[in-house]
Amino acid sequence: MASLGLFLCLSSVLLMSLCQVPTAIEDERKASHVYIAYMGALPSKISYSPMSHHQNILQEVIESSSVEDYLVRSYGRSFNGFAAKLTESEKDKLIGMEGVVSVFPSTVYKLFTTRSYEFMGLGDKSNNVPEVESNVIVGVIDGGIWPESKSFSDEGIGPIPKKWKGTCAGGTNFTCNRKVIGARHYVHDSARDSDAHGSHTASTAAGNKVKGVSVNGVAEGTARGGVPLGRIAVYKVCEPLGCNGERILAAFDDAIADGVDVLTISLGGGVTKVDIDPIAIGSFHAMTKGIVTTVAVGNAGTALAKADNLAPWLISVAAGSTDRKFVTNVVNGDDKMLPGRSINDFDLEGKKYPLAYGKTASNNCTEELARGCASGCLNTVEGKIVVCDVPNNVMEQKAAGAVGTILHVTDVDTPGLGPIAVATLDDTNYEELRSYVLSSPNPQGTILKTNTVKDNGAPVVPAFSSRGPNTLFSDILSNEHSKRNNRPMSQYISSIFTTGSNRVPGQSVDYYFMTGTSMACPHVAGVAAYVKTLRPDWSASAIKSAIMTTAWAMNASKNAEAEFAYGSGFVNPTVAVDPGLVYEIAKEDYLNMLCSLDYSSQGISTIAGGTFTCSEQSKLTMRNLNYPSMSAKVSASSSSDITFSRTVTNVGEKGSTYKAKLSGNPKLSIKVEPATLSFKAPGEKKSFTVTVSGKSLAGISNIVSASLIWSDGSHNVRSPIVVYT
């Protein structure tokens, strides 16, 4: 009887244990995430089936008869890999499998949210060839577009290029034409834009010319992209919550196979290694096909080492202002005019209104909250202009009956169109207005309509644009270009560019201004496409070099972070088509550089799609990658003696001779050997070394810069030289 009791007890324990096993597995399955398995280049075997291979791998990992339920995406058009729903233990098992380079979670990337091309020199008189320009295809990986916009009209554009291999799979309520020749969506049921970001970036890069554009009369002009006759292919990966990594990689997989020439992607995710970053992975394979990829460095502000998208095969773009600024003046009751900034299209006709500030704006909040225009506080502002210590609640002010608002701002950016009259004042002018309000028994004022004036101080890098140095590749300069991004106007679903969906709060507009490095990035994509039209046989690295070495040098006195803010300088597209010399980088050079960063030979072979050996002889340090700029991180407490090795290719005239010219900081001693390069013919290559010596930088500066210019009298090939601690 005792034995029977023991048996029943043990049976119960065993039964409970068996019941708990499925529960544990189910709990782990509920906690699964989407992971991306990157498997490098596609095998060369004709019989290879990526989908079958990926399903077989999952069969081993998941141990389920229906792995199709867990496979999210299979990448197999341009490179190899897949995305799948995996538990933590399944992910760990996958990491060690043959042919898998890396496994990483599909994280959410964020969007980096008319005069600009003329300021860059790409106006109506630029040297474009219509029949060639219309052969260039710009791929836009973003949030879709609004296809009805005039910026996406195919007026004046011929048949679709024969090289195009893509399709128009735009989904619900989306139609392509000879301008927008392709569309794919990886989220929702349509490639149609929902928040204007994608329409803005697409029209900035390659929008058709639209004359007589303005934002309700402000900044009238012609909206255009860098290649107005170029084609656009749309890859919608973003939704309001963000842009998943597995979708981004799928877009790269398709875009490369579709045959785009240039890709623009204004997204970032702060990834710390290139083999777990969908943008770095996708753009690497794009580079091997000659496709240029431009990316935004982000909007993290002036703190150092916050720049995003740092892989050296990318063109990383910071923001820069143009020579146009928008002035919105405030006039107080004493007729004192205070210069402000904003885009205000409301005409108050000079009428002065009561100014509501603090107690006169609210009777249900503290003085401090009311002065900050806190939510729920503005209950006595009807028919008044509200004065706010911080930018806050403009839509709430409109709902409360305010006719306008004056905001205190500390950065240089210009706020966008508002639902009521809006002006912003800097510290000095805001304090003067505040003093008037507090001292006057009946303070009044008005906000004037915006005027567009010339900004002779441009270009500068605005405060929001992310700064270097490069945290992934310490001896490679990040923020390669500063580009017009500060308030381009474009098709706002339309710099001006398009909007299309009229998403300006409280107003309906077709074209609008947007800011952020998101808007700088497609400008450089447009420039790259422009260079591609005139130099169709150039490699991606040659185009990048041409854009970098011909950029306008910028003034470090206006940007304390110097090259960490503006990189090589401000893009100069009309000169970039004829740089004289270029620094070319082959795929093998990048792979040899990865060797020096301790990536395995096996992993690099998989990336390369063939046998690749990392030897001591083949390893290429970051410092000696044939990059168009030169950068080195050094110890602050010791003197430095650094050598850079470079090779340039002649893309100019035969029989040309270039001499080295140096400009820079007396703290650095720079020697170039040889100091003269002579070329007999185009395509000829010449090598040289640059040796930089300097004393300790301790207590002096965290960045010291100079520049090397190779000049033949008509070309000036400029490379920044940066030493930092």
UniProtKB/Swiss-Prot annotation:
Residues annotated as signal peptide: 1-24
Top-level taxonomic group: Eukaryota
Post-translational modification: The C-terminal propeptide is autocleaved.
Record-level Gene Ontology MF annotations: serine-type endopeptidase activity
Domain (Peptidase S8): residue spans on this chain: 116-577
Residues of this chain annotated as glycosylated in UniProt: N173, N364, N555
All copies of domain PA, residue ranges: 352-433
Propeptide cleavage-removed residue intervals: 25-112
Residue ranges annotated for the Inhibitor I9 domain, each copy included: 34-111
A GO CC annotation given for this chain: extracellular region
Protein name as it appears in the record: Subtilisin-like protease SBT4.2
Organism of derivation: Arabidopsis thaliana
Designated gene of the protein: SBT4.2
